[in-house]
Design a protein with these regions (language model features):
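Beta/alpha (TIM)-barrel catalytic core signal, keyed to glycine-rich beta->alpha loops juxtaposed to Asp/Glu
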Residues: 130-314
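Active-site mouth loops of central-metabolism enzymes
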Residues: 23-36, 91-103, 127-132
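Structural motif corresponding to the early beta-alpha repeats
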Residues: 75-100
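Acidic (Asp/Glu)-rich catalytic clusters
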Residues: 8, 71-79, 113-117, 146, ...
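N-terminal binding-site loop/beta-alpha segment at the start of enzyme catalytic domains
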Residues: 1-80
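Conserved beta-strand positions
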Residues: 18, 55, 84, 123-126, ...
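Active-site groove signature of glycoside hydrolases
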Residues: 113-132
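Short, acidic/polar
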Residues: 32-45, 100-116, 164-168
Length: 325
């Protein structure tokens, strides 16, 4: 396993982050694994040297956090880097169980800690931007969470670059904890983040940990076969992203061509491309099988030339912004 410093924190994380959205309960999504199946993957991840785990309170309505915490309880907590997220409403009867008000952050972070069975997380992220709450209130609540010891660092997820810049400016102006990571939507068939967000993160020393590095599975198999997966058959959200627009199909075909040429999988080529991008610290890889996890880790050993990178990128065309919802 390779490790890297996460942004400007000084904290070392594995270059593959295990995404835990697929762990918890199939009552939430049909493709989600139960606890025993999830445990097998998490334990194998640790065997492979992965020390970085990302979950969220909304995944399986909290079950993902509980499952992750139960498995990690059998290991040395000091050797783990655990990240979770909050924003989306957790209880339909409680309007304060979502959003980024002080009340919501305090209660939902504590609920996450309770489910994880931990006193602190290493990284607490806002899952989206909250138009209803002043960013000053959100940042002060997060600053207090760091001072209380509930989290060591704070991060953010998909939003407009102008919003992220405003948050970083407010942290500096008011001497508050600043976001040290950006978990954004970024992969070979969705590169709109290269226009503003990624240069901003590079300038500010913010670590980048992209979600959906394999484009919800679109980059793991020929594009005409994507709909045949369990996720493809059951998740409408998959089709809300513009992967099939612009140059998506041709990029998919070039990934397949290069994978065949190098004797590796399409997923490994797509991950290797991300791992070769200087502004990416660790892509967040979700999986439902040990085999796919092992493939992802092997992507670290794949070398792509400048010509390979250019060949994969050349068909890309601008697409609609996606992932800020």
């Amino acid at each position: 396993m390779e490790y890297t410093t996460l942004g400007s924190t000084g904290m070392e994380v594995s270059r593959i982050c295990l995404g835990c959205m697929s762990f918890g309960s199939s009552d939430w999504r049909e493709w989600v694994l139960d606890e025993d199946e999830s445990r097998e993957i998490i334990e194998r991840a640790i065997d492979l040297g992965i020390n970085f785990f990302d979950t969220a309170n909304m995944y399986s309505a909290g079950e993902s956090e509980r499952v992750l915490g139960d498995v990690l309880a059998d290991y040395d907590r000091d050797s783990q880097v655990v990240a979770t997220k909050g924003y989306f409403q957790m209880d339909e009867s409680d309007p304060n169980s979502g959003g980024l008000s002080r009340k919501a952050i305090e209660q939902e972070l504590q609920n996450s800690l309770d489910r994880l069975g931990m006193d602190t997380v290493d990284l607490y992220q806002i899952h989206r931007w909250d138009d209803q709450t002043p960013i000053e209130e959100t940042l002060r609540a997060l600053d207090d969470a760091v001072r209380r010891g509930d989290t060591r660092y704070v991060g953010a997820s998909s939003m407009w670059a102008r919003q992220f810049a405003a948050a970083l400016h407010e942290s500096e102006r008011s001497d508050l904890e600043r976001f040290v990571t950006m978990q954004n939507h970024y992969n070979l068939v969705y590169r709109e983040e290269e226009r503003e967000m990624l240069p901003l993160c590079a300038d500010e020393g913010v670590g980048v940990i992209p979600w959906s590095p394999l484009a919800r599975g679109y980059l793991t198999r020929p594009h005409e076969d994507v709909d045949a997966t369990t996720r493809g058959e059951n998740e409408e959200y998959l089709y809300e992203h513009p992967y099939r627009e612009g140059g998506g199909p041709e990029i998919n075909e070039r990934v397949a061509e290069l994978a065949a040429e190098k004797g590796v999988t399409m997923a490994q080529i797509a991950l290797a491309w991300l791992l070769h991008k200087e502004w990416v610290d660790a892509p967040i890889v979700g999986t439902t099988s040990v085999e796919h996890l092992e493939d992802a880790v092997e992507a670290l050993s794949i070398s792509l030339s400048e010509g390979d990178m250019a060949y994969l990128e050349e068909p890309y065309e601008p697409v609609r912004v996606s992932g800020h919802e």
